[in-house]
Amino acid sequence: ARALGARYIQPNGPTHRHWIVFDVDHAAATLSWDDVGAPAPNITVTNKANGHAHLIYGLDTPIRTAPDGNAAPLRYAAAIEAALREKLGADMGYSGLICKNPLHEHWLVQVWEPRLYDLAWLSDYLDLSSYNGRKSLPEYGLGRN
């Protein structure tokens, strides 16, 4: 209950990724997804003072990130996360562990896509050809598992 009143929250637990969060640090971050032809985030949470935003994508089926999880879906999700981060021009150093709380009044919150995504739907917007075993995944986000 305390987390609901916090300005920042941890959107995912230790064993599953329900939300993929990107940190976009420029004044037009809220609509940056549209400018580059990326899928609409489910939610944007924007800093009213500078326009920087967290773009949040919800997954209809969470990705298991625990050590006993299946490597193939995890690698696929990591490739999607890396390609989408690149397309959005999002902060490469942001791990997604903590994000702006969409329920906190400090932020400007907008809902763009009410339906949760599956990985195939997200991949429709991305070129994943460089991640088909030839390109190393980043050592952060889903790629570090």
Identify the residue ranges that each predicted region occupies:
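Signature for HUH/AEP ssDNA processing cores
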Residues: 1-53, 59-75
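Poly-acidic low-complexity segments
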Residues: 2-4, 32, 91-94, 118
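Structural alpha-beta junctions
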Residues: 38-44, 81-94
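A structural signal for short, well-ordered beta-strand segments and their strand-loop junctions
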Residues: 45, 54-56, 93-99
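Short secondary-structure subsegments characteristic of cysteine-rich extracellular domains
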Residues: 68-88
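Short, surface-exposed recognition loops or helix-turn segments adjacent to catalytic cores
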Residues: 89-109
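Long, charge-rich alpha-helical interaction segments
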Residues: 105-145
